Structure formats: structure tokens, C-alpha cells
């Protein structure tokens, strides 16, 4: 079995003490399967209008779709928190299907993933709790106010419901970000948080 994990810094393994503690690698260990980590720190679903200080942050999910393994048995897409945090793409309209708006990027990802895999093979993981998630300026650097993190989550759910693609919400299991023993810095899970994420994903897969 081959599982692709498509994500940002959490998928990449940020704040895990070593790569083998990252939830992606833990899933591979627990299921004795091949896992492919497509996590790139700082990346967003939607395309950035103004270049980021770190160029790799602008390797958006829509651009990186081409990197996924079409022979994978399952693909998990875990993102959206950086669109809230520091993305400058407009929210857009429900019917958009372009990487240049958030609605458009989620539509683009969903519609193109369905060209690559059966819908039963695809699952999105919704953004987890994070500190200051109710700030319409995200991490504080947005020039224009936008949605809270919950607003971005609702759009992801709305679009995926339209395409009948599964999504997993682990927020309650991981818990609020503040003073959470599973969260390192108000956003990224620590080793224990990565372990719980892996166990939740394995539980989902075994129930299919």
C-alpha cells in the first residue's frame, strides 16, 4: 500500500524531534506501508499575489499537484492554515476554479484530484486549532482583513461536500492550541501530537 501525504509544515514534520516522529512516517510504521511525504513548510492552497520572503512558501498546493504519485492507494490533503495565516489570495466566489482565489483553489484541488484518483482514495484533513485564529488579519501581516480560520474551514467543507470528498476533522481530539501538551508553539504538534494524528489516520483507514 502506498499513501501520499500532501501538506504544509505539519506534514513536513515541523516541531517533531526527528523525521521518524512525524505523523506521516508514523503512519507508515503502524501500517507497514509506503508513505510519501509531500509536505512543504509555509505553503498554501491558493496562489500568492505578492511573493513571500521565502520562495518555497509560494509553491502552492495547486502548483504541486503534479508531484503526487498517481499510483498511490490513498492521498491525504492537509492544508489551509497558511492561507488563513499569511495568504493574500482573495476569498473569491463559490464557482471559481482557479488557484488565484481560496474558493477557486479548493475547487481546483478537488476537481483535479478526482481526475487522478477515485473519490474513495481521497481525504482532506481540516486545519487544527491555532492561537489567534479569530484575527481577520491572520498572523497580523495581511494588508486587508479576511476570514477567521473557521471561515476558511467552512469553505473547505462546503466545496468538498459539493464533490462528495471525505474530510477529517481532528480538532477536538488534538484540542485547543493554548497550553496544549500536544502542541509545540500554538500551531505545530509536538511528538505526542504527531503520534495522535498518526493514530487517528490509521483508525480512519482501518475503518474503510
Cite the ranges covered by each PLM segment:
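Conserved SGNH/GDSL esterase-like catalytic core that processes O-acyl groups on lipids
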Residues: 2-4, 12-100, 104
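Catalytic His-Asp segment of secreted/periplasmic serine-dependent ester chemistry enzymes
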Residues: 87, 127-208
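Structural signal for conserved beta-strand scaffold positions within catalytic alpha/beta enzyme cores
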Residues: 37-39, 124, 169
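Generic structural signal for well-ordered alpha-helices
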Residues: 65, 106-110, 153
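Residue-level signal for short, function-critical loop segments
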Residues: 9, 81, 128
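Active-site phosphate/pyrophosphate- and oxyanion-stabilizing loops and adjacent acidic/basic residues
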Residues: 25, 111, 154-157
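N-terminal secretory targeting modules
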Residues: 1-6, 10-36, 63-72, 115-122, ...
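Conserved, well-ordered alpha-helix/loop/beta-strand core segments that scaffold catalytic motifs
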Residues: 76-78, 121-125
